């Protein structure tokens, strides 16, 4: 009985993530695609640096917290792209850190369409928080005699087809299944995830554009997660929009604002409200995105990048 109670304490705030949802959730996925699809590396024709911080379920003790940092650029050979993806994801007492290198190869399918193929490889570090071991029940339980922290290697692949106005992609960012704890009593699984994403930009007028986008995430043992976003772009400077997520019985509605501060720098903010059972316990989720691009390849850019 003590073992059952202890495991529930460890998992209660992050049970959705512990068994099959290790890859973190974020709303501004259209600008951070490289985190889940290596084919995106170098697609913006610039050295692109993107940092994101997400505080999910603010006010809920042990709620998920996610930070990502991605750097990617085309190489001298325009067909090749190279990138680095770093992710830190914490939920309850569990913490996952990902460090992956991304490589892409692009072919010209037609005058307006490019097809990119990508590979991703790196390491995942799994850790239980040190404060967990401050509990007397933990120190007295032989199950926790051996610290459950460890590194595991993994790799992934993806494809991205895009033009100046639309894109669609498929990816498997982690192909190898890992049981982080080698235990049948407490399974923290790094499982295979499948992603599909896409979007289209409509010209409403000379100064106004509408971008519709989606992302679908699936992994065995968890509900399919569906993200839908709609954003209006005014004068190539300001994005205003909304998002809607369906994840099993959970729902979330969000508002998005994004400013193109300069040709090189942009900042975005998302506020989400869950509509499920957790709603009374949180003030919502906050997500901040910063992007900076060194456009030393500006002459090669065919048009503004909307994703």
Regions found by a protein language model. Name each.
Residues 1-4, 109-111:
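Positively charged n-region of N-terminal signal peptides that target proteins for export
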Residues 3-6, 22-24:
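Short, basic/polar N-terminal leader/transit segment immediately after the initiator methionine
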Residues 4-14:
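Sec-dependent N-terminal signal peptides
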Residues 21-307:
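Subset of outer-membrane beta-barrel
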Residues 15-20:
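Sec/Tat signal peptide C-region and signal peptidase I cleavage site
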């Amino acid at each position: 009985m003590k073992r059952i109670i202890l495991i529930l304490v460890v998992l209660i705030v992050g049970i959705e993530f512990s068994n099959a949802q290790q890859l973190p959730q974020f709303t501004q996925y259209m600008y951070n695609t490289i985190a889940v699809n290596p084919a995106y590396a170098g697609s913006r024709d610039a050295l692109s640096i993107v940092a994101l911080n997400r505080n999910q379920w603010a006010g809920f003790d042990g709620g998920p917290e996610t930070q990502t940092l991605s750097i990617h650029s085309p190489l001298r050979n325009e067909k090749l792209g190279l990138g680095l993806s770093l992710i830190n994801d914490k939920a309850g007492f569990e913490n996952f850190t990902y460090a992956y290198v991304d490589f892409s190869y692009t072919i010209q399918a037609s005058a307006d369409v490019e097809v990119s193929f990508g590979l991703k490889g790196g390491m995942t570090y799994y850790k239980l928080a040190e404060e967990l071991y401050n509990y007397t029940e933990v120190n007295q339980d032989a199950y926790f005699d051996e610290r459950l922290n460890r590194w595991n290697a993994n790799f992934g692949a993806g494809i991205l087809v895009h033009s100046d106005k639309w894109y669609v992609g498929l990816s498997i960012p982690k192909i190898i299944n890992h049981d982080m704890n080698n235990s049948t009593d407490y399974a923290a699984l790094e499982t295979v995830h499948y992603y599909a994403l896409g979007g289209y930009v409509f010209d409403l007028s000379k100064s106004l554009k509408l971008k519709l986008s989606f992302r679908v995430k699936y992994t065995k043992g968890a509900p399919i997660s569906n993200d839908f976003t709609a954003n209006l772009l005014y004068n190539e400077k300001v994005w205003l929009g909304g998002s809607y997520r369906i994840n099993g019985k959970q729902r979330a509605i969000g508002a998005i604002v994004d400013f193109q501060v300069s040709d090189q720098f942009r900042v975005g903010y998302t506020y989400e409200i869950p509509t499920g059972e957790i709603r009374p316990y949180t003030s919502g989720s906050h997500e901040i995105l910063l992007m900076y691009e060194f456009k030393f390849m500006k002459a090669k850019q065919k048009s503004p990048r909307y994703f």
